[in-house]
């Protein structure tokens, strides 16, 4: 009887324990939900005075009004900024998450100059499986330490070493474009993107992947497939939960692509580490450095050498994060800027003639490589690129997740709000850019830039978290454009409304950039 009683008592205890555990778990969930609702109600009340684009409904906000298609969504946001241009800021609720849209220089300055508001939007978490917590996605003390460590790697004296790679790949591109001379219009977006990918691979990793020669290579295909999957996931809230995402084919493809990209980068790092060790062993044995076909250094070599203030080197994982980040950030943005430049030059022949004259003054009829001194002389081309990035900023909008309450334009904005900065709209403020839809590189002549608000133009962001690679990007854009425009005259008959602007992380033309090429000098072979 005793054993029976003990057994029954044990079962009761187990049942009681299970019930208690369920009760505790349920209470915890309810408590979390209650805390979220209280926080949501506080934000709703605190941000009520901020002008809203339309009536927002509790919990769903404006989500029911937002367009699901990326092209239509971007056009909708831009339409709001145009409609409410007279207001200092506007508010949207995407579900329970509040967003404030910033498109006036004085308000953008408040966020971008803050040393506290440096956290990227929660959307950037979808980049973390690929990029880890590198310079783009990290926050707080890790970001500050990493930024300080890497900034010297982007000094002009170091970037000059990358110019040979840019020239070589630009010449391959020019040779590829030859077949289109005096032919029908073609979409130049993809070949230019492959050129930018070749440049970033060789400068970041010291690896020539030959994307321009073989655009169907596994690495190239995986890079583009991964980027597309990330963009799609950002727009699909039902894919935001990792376990749920992996239940679908796209989630499994995403995981497979990650493994492929990380394996490629890991192998390149291992090769570079082994090569450096072999060379150091030779030097240590008194045999001198190993013979090498090239003395070029890649960004990877710099990462293998840098140390923090305490003399600590980056780990293998740290290095992979930064190489992958440089790869991701460094080709799409520059490729977009070059394509938009060609479109605008092809649509504005009077501007193109001025560029041609400057190129002739610097290079004559020579086909020699572009030098750093040449780039310094190409001042009008520099203005063309700046004006291109004003009209079509490569990154049309970006966001900060506010880490504390702040005040903008007299309105109190709650902690946790997504502050969405919209360069596409900011750059069209008629106070600083009259006739904003007109393509006028002269806006950026020194005498015409005086008095302009320093935050009226932010193609590379601004403040402490501005783009660390902007000098590299401009150098690449000028070099490739100089090589193309020395050889070809560009014609474009596309109208703006035919482009199909899509504003994901990068501003892209859904319908491509279609141009015609003519040889500039008919007597050239």
Curated annotation (Swiss-Prot):
Catalytic activity: dodecanoate + reduced [NADPH--hemoprotein reductase] + O2 = 12-hydroxydodecanoate + oxidized [NADPH--hemoprotein reductase] + H2O + H(+); tetradecanoate + reduced [NADPH--hemoprotein reductase] + O2 = 14-hydroxytetradecanoate + oxidized [NADPH--hemoprotein reductase] + H2O + H(+); hexadecanoate + reduced [NADPH--hemoprotein reductase] + O2 = 16-hydroxyhexadecanoate + oxidized [NADPH--hemoprotein reductase] + H2O + H(+); (5Z,8Z,11Z,14Z,17Z)-eicosapentaenoate + reduced [NADPH--hemoprotein reductase] + O2 = 20-hydroxy-(5Z,8Z,11Z,14Z,17Z)-eicosapentaenoate + oxidized [NADPH--hemoprotein reductase] + H2O + H(+)
Cystine pairs: none
Location (main, coarse): endoplasmic reticulum
CC terms in the record's Gene Ontology section: endoplasmic reticulum membrane
Keywords linked to the UniProt accession: Endoplasmic reticulum, Heme, Iron, Lipid metabolism, Membrane, Metal-binding, Monooxygenase, NADP, Oxidoreductase, Transmembrane, Transmembrane helix
Annotated compartments: Endoplasmic reticulum membrane
SUPFAM superfamilies for the chain: Cytochrome P450
The keyword Phosphoprotein is assigned to this record: no
Protein origin, superkingdom: Eukaryota
Membrane topology, from the record: Single-pass membrane protein
Glycoprotein is among the record's keywords: no
Role: A cytochrome P450 monooxygenase involved in fatty acid metabolism in the eye. Catalyzes the omega-hydroxylation of polyunsaturated fatty acids (PUFAs) docosahexaenoate (DHA) and its precursor eicosapentaenoate (EPA), and may contribute to the homeostasis of these retinal PUFAs. Omega hydroxylates saturated fatty acids such as laurate, myristate and palmitate, the catalytic efficiency decreasing in the following order: myristate > laurate > palmitate (C14>C12>C16).
Family that this chain belongs to: Belongs to the cytochrome P450 family.
Name of the protein: Cytochrome P450 4V2
């Amino acid at each position: 009887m005793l054993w029976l009683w003990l057994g029954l008592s044990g079962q009761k205890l187990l049942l009681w324990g299970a019930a208690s555990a369920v009760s505790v778990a349920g209470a915890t969930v309810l408590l979390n939900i209650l805390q979220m609702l209280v926080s949501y109600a506080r934000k709703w009340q605190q941000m009520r005075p901020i002008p809203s684009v339309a009536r927002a409904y509790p919990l769903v906000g404006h989500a029911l009004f937002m367009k699901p298609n990326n092209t239509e969504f971007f056009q909708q946001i831009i339409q709001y900024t145009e409609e409410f241009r007279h207001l200092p800021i506007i508010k949207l609720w995407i579900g329970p998450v509040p967003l404030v849209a910033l498109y006036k220089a004085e308000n953008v300055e408040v966020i971008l100059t803050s040393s506290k508001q440096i956290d990227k939007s929660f959307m950037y978490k979808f980049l973390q499986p690929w990029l880890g917590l590198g310079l783009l996605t990290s926050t707080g003390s890790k970001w500050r330490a990493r930024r300080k460590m890497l900034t010297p790697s982007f000094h002009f004296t170091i970037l000059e070493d990358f110019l040979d790679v840019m020239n070589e790949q630009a010449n391959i591109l020019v040779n590829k474009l030859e077949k289109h001379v005096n032919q029908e219009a073609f979409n130049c977006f993809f070949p230019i993107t492959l050129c930018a990918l070749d440049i970033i691979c060789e400068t970041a990793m010291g690896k020539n992947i030959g994307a321009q020669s073989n655009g169907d290579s596994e690495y190239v295909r995986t890079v583009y497939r991964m980027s597309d999957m990330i963009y799609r996931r950002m727009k699909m809230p039902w894919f935001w939960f990792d376990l749920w995402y992996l239940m679908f084919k796209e989630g499994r493809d995403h995981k497979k692509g990650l493994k492929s990209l990380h394996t490629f980068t890991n192998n390149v790092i291992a090769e570079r580490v082994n090569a450096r060790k072999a060379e150091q062993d030779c030097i240590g044995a008194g045999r001198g450095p190993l013979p090498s076909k090239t003395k070029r250094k890649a960004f990877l070599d710099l990462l293998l050498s840098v140390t923090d203030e305490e003399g600590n080197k980056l780990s293998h994982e740290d290095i992979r994060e930064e190489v992958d980040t440089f790869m991701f950030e460094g080709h799409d943005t520059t490729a977009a800027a070059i394509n938009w430049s060609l479109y605008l030059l092809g649509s504005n022949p009077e501007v193109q003639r001025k560029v041609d004259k400057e190129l002739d003054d610097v290079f004559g009829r020579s086909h020699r490589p572009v030098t750093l001194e040449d780039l310094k002389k190409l001042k009008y081309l520099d203005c063309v690129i700046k004006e291109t990035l004003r009209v079509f900023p490569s990154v049309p909008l970006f966001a900060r997740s506010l880490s504390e309450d702040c005040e903008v334009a007299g309105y109190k904005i709650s902690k946790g709000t997504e502050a969405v900065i919209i360069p596409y709209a900011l750059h069209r403020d008629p106070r600083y850019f009259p006739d904003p839809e007109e393509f006028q590189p002269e806006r950026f002549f020194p005498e015409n830039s005086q008095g302009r608000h320093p935050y009226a133009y932010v193609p590379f962001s601004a403040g402490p978290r501005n783009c660390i690679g902007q000098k590299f990007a401009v150098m690449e854009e000028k070099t490739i454009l100089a090589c193309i425009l020395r050889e070809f005259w560009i014609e474009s008959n596309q109208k703006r409304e035919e482009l199909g602007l899509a504003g994901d992380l990068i501003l892209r033309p859904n319908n491509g950039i279609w141009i015609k090429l003519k040889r500039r000098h008919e007597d050239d072979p």
